[in-house]
Amino acid sequence: MKSSTQAVLEHTAIPKHIAVIMDGNGRWAKKRFLPRIMGHKRGLDALENMVKHCAKLGVQYLTVFAFSTENWRRPEDEVSFLMGLFLQALQKQVRRLHENNMRLKILGSRERFNRQILQGIEEAEALTANNTGLTLSIAADYGGRWDILQAANKLIAEGVSEITEDTLAKHLMLGDAPEPDLFIRTGGETRISNFLLWQMAYAELYFTDILWPDFDGKALDDAVASFQKRERRFGRTSEQLPIEQQRN
């Protein structure tokens, strides 16, 4: 049976692109007197459910922050486990994505990944490259400032004499995707932590105290419902918006 929230969502605008910082895995485990790595394992399960629910709602792009450039500073055993979990997801979950016509992209620097992970990334992206369903982008060893810098360096290398917003945007890691409409951060923190700094200029921000492993379909429905109540003006006045976009 559909919830009342789901019924409303089906008849109103769904964000085309959702970006998520999946925060709270460690605290979820700590509350249960479990090692932090167990929180990360449950976090992977939550991501699987998120992908399914986004596809069900009609979301076209889902971009998640899995591992930042700053996360290399974490304890060595935790970083090692996260890399292993990342490889496991690439090897096992990509088949499921492919079977459901979903595309997988990995965003970020690849300089510090080992050969096995690099091979896994290349194979996963190649397998799903021609799929036309939801695009799942996983930001790993990624930072928003790094993204802008690498785009600028590409333009310099190409000999571009004048950098415009359009040319820079096309050289970012998400250059072939629309900018996020909705940004969600779980775990109670209220910052964007160097994630998609350029691309989220006009995203609607949604923060929740729910820890990532507990973020389920209902929680996503609530986030989307909040998005739908907002009036996105992009610098214009309410009166300049089409009637259907104006908030009563």
Swiss-Prot record:
InterPro entries: UPP_synth-like, UPP_synth-like_CS, UPP_synth-like_sf
UniProt-annotated binding residues for Mg(2+): D23, E204
Residues at the catalytic site: D23, N71 (proton acceptor)
Listed cofactors: Mg(2+)
Transferase recorded as keyword: yes
Magnesium as UniProt keyword: yes
SUPFAM superfamilies with a match to the protein in the record: Undecaprenyl diphosphate synthase
Listed GO MF terms: ditrans,polycis-undecaprenyl-diphosphate synthase [(2E,6E)-farnesyl-diphosphate specific] activity; magnesium ion binding
Keywords per UniProt: Magnesium, Metal-binding, Transferase
Pfam families given in the database record: Prenyltransf
UniProt binding sites for substrate: 24-28, 36, 40, 68-70, 72, 74, 185, 191-193
Cellular component per GO, a single term: cytosol
Broad EC category: transferase
Ranges in coiled-coil conformation: none
Cofactor info, note text: Binds 2 magnesium ions per subunit.
Single biological process term from Gene Ontology: polyprenol biosynthetic process
Regions crossing the membrane: none
EC number per UniProt: 2.5.1.-
Subunit structure of this chain's protein: Homodimer.
NCBIfam families: PRK14830.1, uppS
Sequence similarity: Belongs to the UPP synthase family.
Stored HAMAP family: ISPT
Function: Catalyzes the condensation of isopentenyl diphosphate (IPP) with allylic pyrophosphates generating different type of terpenoids.
Protein name as annotated: Isoprenyl transferase
Protein species of origin: Neisseria meningitidis serogroup B (strain ATCC BAA-335 / MC58)
Classification lineage: Bacteria, Pseudomonadati, Pseudomonadota, Betaproteobacteria, Neisseriales
